[in-house]
Amino acid sequence: MAIFKQLFKVILLAGISASAFASNIMLEHGYIRAMPASVPNTAAYLTLSNHGAATELVSASTPVAREAMLHTLIEEDGLVKMRHVEAFPLPEHGQLTLQGSGDHIMIMGLKAPLELGQKVPMTLSFANGETLNIELEVKSPNDAPAAQEHHHHH
């Protein structure tokens, strides 16, 4: 009888790990902004595609920093300010784009300076219970695709 319990656990765990790869959410592109070694914070910018039902990005984490928070930029009294937000909507069969001029993931309390070209692991968590493990490269803002696409707006 004990062998059936063990077999059941193995099948259950195999089912859980297989479902982790069946995500409808995919990273299209992204990067982490390179900062001087003396600066303890940076930001991640990315585009996610959702091939399923609508959900929300509710948190991010990375082992290279104390915390990662969802932030947006708002204009208040003529000044642009950063604000923490609880979630970013990811529409059904749509995209979520986080870029320098708006929504982004603020990475705070870096444990060590990040190097250009370094690959940084990050886990994104969604309101529907899904998680997405991604890797973002540290890039200079001038080399990043989003900076090139939006450079003429500044």
PLM-predicted stretches and their roles:
Residues 1-11:
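Bacterial N-terminal signal peptides that target proteins for export
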Residues 9-19:
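Bacterial N-terminal signal peptides
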